[in-house]
């Protein structure tokens, strides 16, 4: 599936948020790219809405058409559209692998999923956008357990913070999905209501 593969630090600086997670280059220069990191001009309501959409889209690594599809699905569900949207994004398999501490970044997690290293409820899944649900069990496939990324993940897992809606068992390279995440458990710095306003005007 198509995805953005360009420089993420520049995107992070432009949007004012670390899109990678632990991006030291962004931490050194957390201001917009350009000469001397000049200050932002006053942004219109539309630009503020667009920026929030782009933050979410690039954080989860999805292209515009797919992101719009997530919004459409979120708007059909009961509850707040913004909360539903973030829940759909959080429940992508690649994001769950990242959140569980089994990959360095979401981009790395996407690669591991695409290469077929994971099973969901005992069945191989190689689609990064696969939606996990409550009570799903995600395992690294047995033949992949001794690959370097997973050895490193086991050895360094104590450094990662796993959200409460998931349980990671690094000794078995297993993730248990206890529940679907609620907004308070999703720690990305995005104002989802601005995303809803952006699409509601389309």
Curated annotation (Swiss-Prot):
GO terms for molecular function: rRNA binding; structural constituent of ribosome. It comes from the Bacteria. Pfam families: Ribosomal_S4, S4. The keyword Cell cycle does not apply. PROSITE patterns: RIBOSOMAL_S4, S4. Keywords: Ribonucleoprotein, Ribosomal protein, RNA-binding, rRNA-binding. One of the primary rRNA binding proteins, it binds directly to 16S rRNA where it nucleates assembly of the body of the 30S subunit. With S5 and S12 plays an important role in translational accuracy. NCBIfam families: PRK05327.1 (NF003717), rpsD_bact (TIGR01017). Belongs to the universal ribosomal protein uS4 family. Part of the 30S ribosomal subunit. Contacts protein S5. The interaction surface between S4 and S5 is involved in control of translational fidelity. This is Small ribosomal subunit protein uS4.
